[in-house]
Design a protein with these regions (language model features):
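Short, acidic, metal-binding catalytic loop of nucleotide-sugar glycosyltransferases
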Residues: 26-35
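A conserved acidic beta->alpha catalytic loop
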Residues: 42-51, 97
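Acidic donor-binding loop at a coil-to-helix junction in glycosyltransferase catalytic cores
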Residues: 185, 206-213
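Short aromatic/hydrophobic "clamp" motif used to bind/position activated sugar donors
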Residues: 90
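Cell-envelope/extracellular polymer assembly enzymes that use nucleotide-activated donors
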Residues: 6-9, 37, 212
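Conserved donor NDP-sugar-binding/catalytic core segment of glycosyltransferases
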Residues: 102-151
Length: 274
C-alpha cells in the first residue's frame, strides 16, 4: 500500500454502546494500514461514550461528531460526519463491527474510481460478543475459527468467511449470489461520490437507508465490487428496539421510488433541495 495516492477515513456510527465501540476501536488501533481519520457519527449518546472516545484520542486520529438524541436519526448524523470528514476515500461501518487487522488495507487495495466496495460481516452470538477482550482483538485470536469454536460457536458454512485464505476469499467473492450492495456495516467509496448523491436520505429511519444510498450511487453510474469474503469484521450481537414495521414499509416505498425514478440526489440530504 506504499503507492496509495489517496487519504482514507473510517466513519463509525454509534449510539449508547460504549462497551461495543471500545472493542471496535481496539480493532482500528491494530490495522496494518492506519486510517488518516476516524469520524465517529454519534446519534446522541450519553457522556460515557464521549469519555471513551476521548480516551482513544491520543492513539487514534478521531473526530467526534455528535447531535442531541431525537430518536433514530442515523442518516442525519452520517451526513454530518460526511461534512466533517476530509479523507478522499471513506469506509463506513458501525459500533458493533470489529475490523480484522487487514480491514482498512483491503478496502484500500480494491478502491477504484467509478466503484464502491461491498463488504459483509460475520455475526457472533451474544455470549461470545461479551467474551471478546482487548488481547483477543490485538492477537487476532477473535478471528480464529479454532478459538471461536472453543468458545462455543456453532459450525456453519458462514464460517468460511474466517478461513483467512486470500485466494479462497477472492473465489468466493466471485461466485457468491449475494449482490454487491451498499451495506452500512461494511462499505466504502469516494467522498466526492457521496456528495454527488447528496449523502443519505434523512427522511429514512431504521431499515434500508444504506441500501437506498447505494441505489442512488448506481443511478449515478457508479458500479460495485464484492469483497464480503476479503474485508472481514466481526458483528457483535445487540437488540434492535428502533426497528418498526411502519418505518420499514416507508423505507421500502422510498427505495422503490429511487430505483424507478433513477434519481441520484436525495432532496433531504446534506443539502436540502426544494
Amino acid at each position: 500500500m506504499e503507492n496509495r495516492n489517496f487519504t482514507v477515513g473510517v466513519v463509525i456510527s454509534t449510539y449508547n454502546s460504549p462497551k461495543w465501540l471500545e472493542k471496535v476501536l481496539w480493532g482500528y488501533e491494530n490495522q496494518t494500514v492506519k486510517p488518516d481519520e476516524i469520524v465517529i457519527a454519534d446519534d446522541g449518546s450519553k457522556d460515557d461514550t464521549r469519555q471513551l472516545i476521548e480516551s482513544f484520542a491520543s492513539r487514534l486520529p478521531i473526530k467526534h461528531v455528535w447531535h442531541e438524541d431525537r430518536g433514530f436519526q442515523k442518516s442525519q448524523i452520517l451526513n454530518k460526519a460526511l461534512v466533517a470528514s476530509t479523507a478522499d476515500y471513506l469506509i463506513f461501518t458501525d459500533q458493533d463491527c470489529i475490523p480484522r487487522a487487514d480491514f482498512v488495507e483491503t478496502h484500500c487495495k480494491y478502491a477504484e474510481h467509478g466503484y464502491f466496495l461491498s463488504g459483509g460481516y460475520f455475526k457472533l452470538p451474544m455470549d461470545i460478543s461479551l467474551q471478546i477482550g482487548k488481547d483477543d482483538v490485538v492477537s487476532q485470536r477473535a478471528f480464529s475459527l479454532k478459538w471461536l469454536f472453543a468458545q462455543g460457536l456453532k459450525k456453519s458454512f458462514k464460517c468460511t468467511k474466517l478461513l483467512g485464505n486470500a485466494g479462497f476469499a477472492k473465489f468466493m467473492n466471485a461466485i457468491t449470489p449475494t449482490k454487491a450492495t451498499w451495506n452500512g456495516c461494511n462499505a466504502s467509496g469516494w467522498r466526492e461520490d457521496a456528495f454527488r448523491v447528496n449523502g443519505y436520505n434523512e427522511e429514512m429511519h431504521y431499515g434500508g437507508q444504506d441500501r437506498e444510498f447505494g441505489e442512488r450511487l448506481f443511478n449515478l453510474g457508479i458500479k460495485s465490487k464484492q469483497i464480503r469474503y476479503s474485508a472481514i469484521c466481526l458483528h457483535l450481537d445487540h437488540k434492535r428496539p428502533y426497528k418498526t414495521k411502519e418505518t420499514l414499509e416507508k423505507n421500502l416505498a422510498i427505495r422503490k421510488n429511487t430505483r424507478k425514478s433513477g434519481i441520484t440526489e436525495t432532496p433531504n440530504g446534506i443539502k436540502k433541495i426544494q
